[in-house]
């Protein structure tokens, strides 16, 4: 380590090593009696490189816009140890000239520029379009390796290694970034009503398997433009046995657009901890233990508890798994590259020939045959070698997609990640490099979109990009008007001119599959629909209906799926056509345009549309086979989506009277009942499926089922709980919680059997968010209504004291509301009060039961959301008439009601125990934002 002693007026600089060890950065001070150092004119500067300009040139003290001098960013070692302000003796040369304190006491002034004077919190601002917050990501967890995996042969002729750049600089982590978003969490929390559960903290080294961030700062370091910095520091990930090239060419040069440089999964350690873990944050959002929600009825609390018990810790556990796998996947993709000459995964040794044979067999049987829908057709007797030779791209995609039905005994996660990475590079090379426009590319992209299973977060998915390219290729190779116009130059009749997709034997089926997948993906991501119903899809349906086995010209080869399944595909496509119309003409309507229209005409027009779509769905339903539960479940989800629109419009119109009980129109009540029965039927049909049928479901199919779960829980069930006008429909939705728990348990069972289906984990994560959001919002409604009830009681007492008997005058204003409430004679409520948690008992509304005398009511704080504005005097009078059924732990007679005030809730249903299963608000906010604006967010009603 060299020590540089400069001439008079120049600081003595010390060069430190470029490693991260703090011990290497420390250098011994020169002795005070060294004759070459003048304490009055020279200083010692540590912690900067040899070519740092602060060593050679004077540094002026910064000034503000108003001309005032700023405080020095670095204090000298002496002032820093004394915690005193360091004032430079020369404001035009603050580092090379001693400070006033050292100059006064004739001490040697030394500056350590390798560390800051304090830990600064990052500024809460969003990055500009010209900059992007960068972080260096490293991990101690080993990559996906396994002794049983197929090792690749060394010395492959077309593979060469590209060493990483050793001069790649590092840069500090300046902010916490949401997964896949250029926005800091501090910016997000500022828009929420809850305070942030964590602030900007220095990153710390975590245990094995956790992700850490690099905090050391290089003085005068700038963000490097060399893309090798994105892949040069991870030396612990063991993926050397993959046939990949470690190259700097894989990372994009523009840092702001690097797909994985801002690795959202690497920042998972900054997420707020879930309730139940050790508290490590300075600020923690917790629900107050002294909450009005303890006065819910026992059955309501027990059923609510059964819901969130089933989801306890699921958000944390699933997100940790997704985070770990996504980190490994991104590392592998970021650092690997397969040359275009690579044809298939068998030739490079990612999977063996035996495993490829197994995967192809599973695709033919478990995915294609059992699906009862003619997806991408493969001949039954085609072998691995034949498919590799004829359609190597489709073969590679099939090998990747079949991972969803494999068990741990059949493959490993490391092999799957290598295979997915290979497919990603192969597809990219064929589309963007080789410019390959063929039917095989359409088949490959369509298959990939149907069973997309890459290990990545929702905010990092690429299937919508593949879907867009697939739609473009379908238009290019399909019967477009461009192809028709060029037909006039041929010898054939232009009307008989056929496009490549029309000439292909499975062209009609492929056209409908692209339409179905593209439509659902567009709705799923709330994007503009890429493939709409047109004359092309209409003609494809007609061709499939007329098609026979003989017209396919397969004399010796037998197709796995013959023409008998084509009518099912046609009906499924028409069902999606109705879904497209419902989404486009109803859910995506611009309500602002209605301001200029006649409301009566608009209402009639919408009613006619709904009647038309309902009639079309009924015609399709009569042609469906009742023994196909997956198709029937999809149908019910579409029909529920139809009725959901009218309910959403009605709730939006009554937002100003949302807390008042008004009589529901008959048509709204009927639509609510129909919507609930459709949701219930869809989930019941889905529950009939075996795990193998669930794991082989396409992405678009499962997404509609999960959306139906959220609609049932957060739209329908929450409406009868929170909106007084829907209270009378409470008995109808009593089995909603049991259905949600049943679907969740079925998905968990399927995930245990097929742990490599990453989409199942994502859907379980969404259901966990649904359940936790529902529980939090229900308790918030209970607290809010009871708090307002207490305020009204206090106001009533003050009015009675101040005005005497005049205080009872406004009471009669609420008599009408009390007469509209349900009575004790409701047989559905009376029959559901003695169920236990395991059987998922009926969940009472937060319509908290009333007792006969005022003392018991005041002690128990029991009230009703529908009686929120009711006075104690009216409360006593209304008990003589029709009244609401009391909760199970309060008797109907006065004596038992008074004695019940001393009964304590059981530990299994106490509100404190209930709060232990709730996830904090910040975690829910993070989870919702990580869904990348998917259509789940439409289900959260924040205005109720």
Swiss-Prot record:
The GO molecular function terms of this record are: DNA-binding transcription factor activity; DNA-binding transcription factor activity, RNA polymerase II-specific; sequence-specific DNA binding; zinc ion binding
Per UniProt, the keywords (alphabetical) are: DNA-binding, Metal-binding, Nucleus, Phosphoprotein, Transcription, Transcription regulation, Zinc
Q: What is this protein called?
A: Weak acid resistance protein 1
Residue ranges flagged as DNA-binding region: 76-109
- High-level lineage: Eukaryota, Fungi, Dikarya, Ascomycota, Saccharomycotina
Species name for this entry? Answer: Saccharomyces cerevisiae (strain ATCC 204508 / S288c) (Baker's yeast)
The UniProt gene name for this protein comes to WAR1
Impact upon substituting residue 703 to P: Causes hyperactivitywith constitutive induction of PDR12
* Segments of this protein annotated with the region Disordered: 114-171, 197-225
Lineage top rank: taxon: Eukaryota
* Subunit details: Homodimer.
Which cellular component terms (GO) are annotated to the entry? mitochondrion; nucleus
- Where does the record say this protein resides? Nucleus
């Amino acid at each position: 380590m060299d020590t540089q002693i400069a001439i008079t007026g120049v600081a003595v600089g010390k060069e430190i090593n470029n490693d991260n060890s703090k011990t290497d950065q420390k250098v011994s001070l020169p002795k005070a009696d060294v004759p070459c150092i003048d304490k009055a004119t020279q200083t010692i500067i540590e912690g900067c490189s040899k070519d740092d300009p602060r060593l050679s040139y004077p540094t002026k003290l910064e000034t503000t816009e108003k001309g005032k001098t700023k405080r020095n960013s670095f204090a000298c070692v002496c002032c820093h140890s004394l915690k005193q302000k360091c004032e430079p003796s020369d404001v035009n040369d603050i580092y090379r000239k001693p400070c006033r304190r050292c100059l006064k006491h004739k001490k040697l002034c030394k500056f350590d520029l390798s560390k800051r004077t304090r830990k600064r919190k990052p500024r809460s601002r969003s990055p500009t379009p010209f900059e992007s917050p960068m972080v260096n990501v490293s991990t101690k967890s080993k990559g996906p390796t396994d002794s049983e995996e197929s090792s690749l042969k060394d010395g492959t002729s077309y593979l060469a290694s590209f060493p990483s750049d050793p001069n790649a600089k590092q840069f500090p982590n300046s902010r916490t970034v949401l997964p896949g978003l250029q926005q800091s969490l501090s910016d997000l929390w500022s828009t929420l009503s809850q305070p942030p559960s964590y602030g900007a903290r220095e990153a710390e080294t975590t245990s094995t398997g956790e992700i850490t961030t690099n905090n050391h700062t290089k003085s005068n370091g700038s963000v490097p433009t060399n893309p090798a910095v994105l892949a040069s520091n991870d030396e612990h990930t063991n993926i050397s046995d993959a046939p990949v090239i470690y190259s700097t060419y894989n990372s994009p040069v523009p840092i702001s657009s690097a797909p994985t440089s801002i690795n959202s999964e690497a920042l998972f350690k900054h997420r707020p901890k879930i309730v139940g873990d050790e508290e490590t944050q300075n600020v923690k959002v917790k629900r107050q233990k002294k909450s009005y929600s303890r006065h819910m009825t026992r059955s309501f609390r027990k059923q609510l508890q059964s819901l969130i018990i089933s989801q306890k810790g699921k958000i944390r556990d699933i997100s940790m798994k997704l985070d770990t796998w996504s980190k490994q996947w991104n590392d592998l993709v970021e650092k690997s590259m397969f040359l275009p000459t690579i044809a298939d995964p068998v030739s490079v040794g990612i999977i063996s020939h035996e495993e490829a044979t197994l995967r192809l067999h599973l695709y033919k049987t478990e995915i294609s045959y059992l699906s009862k829908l003619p997806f991408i057709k493969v001949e039954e007797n085609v072998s691995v070698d034949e498919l590799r030779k004829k359609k190597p791209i489709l073969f590679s995609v099939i090998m990747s997609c079949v991972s969803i039905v494999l068990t741990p005994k059949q493959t490993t996660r490391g092999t799957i990640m290598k295979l997915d990475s290979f497919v990603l590079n192969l597809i990219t090379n064929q589309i963007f490099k080789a410019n390959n426009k063929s039917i095989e590319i359409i088949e490959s992209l369509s298959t990939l979109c149907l069973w997309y299973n890459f290990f990545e977060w929702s905010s990092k998915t690429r299937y919508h990009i593949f879907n867009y390219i697939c739609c473009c290729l379908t238009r290019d190779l399909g019967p477009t008007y461009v192809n028709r116009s060029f037909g006039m130059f041929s010898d054939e009749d232009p009307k008989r001119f056929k496009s490549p997709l029309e000439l292909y034997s499975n062209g009609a089926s492929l056209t409908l599959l692209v339409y179905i997948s593209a439509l659902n993906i567009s709705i799923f991501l709330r994007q503009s629909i890429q493939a709409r119903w047109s004359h092309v899809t209409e003609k494809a349906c007609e061709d499939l209906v007329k098609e026979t086995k003989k017209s396919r010209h397969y004399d010796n080869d037998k197709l796995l799926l013959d023409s008998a399944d084509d009518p099912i595909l046609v009906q499924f496509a028409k069902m999606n056509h109705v879904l497209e119309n419902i989404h486009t003409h109803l859910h995506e309507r611009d309500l602002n345009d209605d301001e200029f229209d006649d409301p009566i005409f608009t209402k009639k027009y919408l009613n006619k549309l709904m009647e038309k779509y309902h009639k079309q769905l009924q015609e399709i339903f009569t042609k469906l086979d009742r023994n196909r539960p997956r198709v029937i479940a999809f149908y019910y989800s579409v029909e529920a989506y139809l009725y959901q629109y009218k309910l959403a419009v009605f709730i939006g119109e009554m937002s100003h009277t949302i807390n008042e009980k008004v009589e529901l129109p008959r048509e709204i009540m009927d639509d609510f009942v129909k919507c609930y029965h459709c949701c219930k039927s869809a989930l019941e049909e889905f529950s009939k499926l075996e795990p193998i049928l669930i794991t082989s479901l396409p992405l678009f199919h499962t997404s509609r089922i999960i959306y139906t779960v959220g609609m049932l829980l957060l739209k329908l069930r929450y409406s009868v709980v929170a909106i007084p006008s829907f209270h009378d429909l409470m008995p109808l939705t009593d089995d909603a919680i049991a259905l949600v728990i049943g679907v969740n348990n079925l998905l968990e069972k399927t995930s245990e059997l097929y742990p490599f289906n990453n989409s199942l984990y994502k859907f379980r994560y969404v259901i966990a968010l649904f359940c936790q959001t529902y529980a939090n919002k229900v308790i918030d409604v209970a607290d809010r209504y009871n708090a307002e009830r207490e305020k009204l009681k206090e106001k009533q007492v003050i009015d009675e004291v101040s005005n005497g008997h005049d205080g009872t005058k406004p009471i009669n204003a609420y008599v009408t509301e009390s007469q509209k409430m349900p009575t004790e004679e409701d047989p559905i409520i009376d029959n559901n009060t003695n169920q236990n948690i395991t059987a998922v008992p009926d969940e009472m509304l937060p319509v908290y039961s009333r007792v006969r005398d005022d003392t018991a009511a005041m002690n128990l704080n029991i009230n009703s959301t529908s009686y929120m504005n009711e006075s104690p005097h009216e409360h006593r009078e209304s008990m003589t008439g029709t009244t609401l059924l009391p909760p199970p732990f309060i008797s109907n007679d006065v004596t038992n009601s008074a004695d019940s005030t001393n009964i304590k809730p059981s530990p299994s249903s106490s509100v404190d125990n209930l709060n232990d299963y709730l996830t904090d608000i910040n975690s829910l906010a993070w989870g919702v934002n990580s869904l990348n604006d998917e259509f789940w967010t439409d289900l959260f009603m924040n205005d109720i």
